[in-house]
Amino acid sequence: GEKYDEFVDKFVRAARKHYPNAYIHFEDFGLNNARRILDKYTPEISCFNDDVQGTGCVTLAAIMAAFQVSGVKWEDARFVMFGSGTAGTGIADQIKDAISQRSGKSTEEAGQQIW
């Protein structure tokens, strides 16, 4: 709620004031807050949310290794996500960006390869 957002904002402002070059690692903010808070502060500070981005990075690395071994092309791959939690949506975002970057498709087109 509002008090939660005020607390996070107060912390981020204090961290920026005292440690202007700090990298902030957000952890366990939950589905309703993780993406929203990450999106709010990413343009302003160096930050990372393990729930959204960490699991996605590890999963993407595994997919990239599998594609290298198997020869599967990004534009030919299809992905099914089971669950819509913070990690699942983060994984889907990482995969969508990778498809777009590696195949030249728009992110909208890339998203059509993910269910």
Language-model-derived ranges and their functions:
Residues 1-75, 81, 86, 90, ...:
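Metallocofactor- and cofactor-centric catalytic cores in central/energy metabolism, strongly enriched
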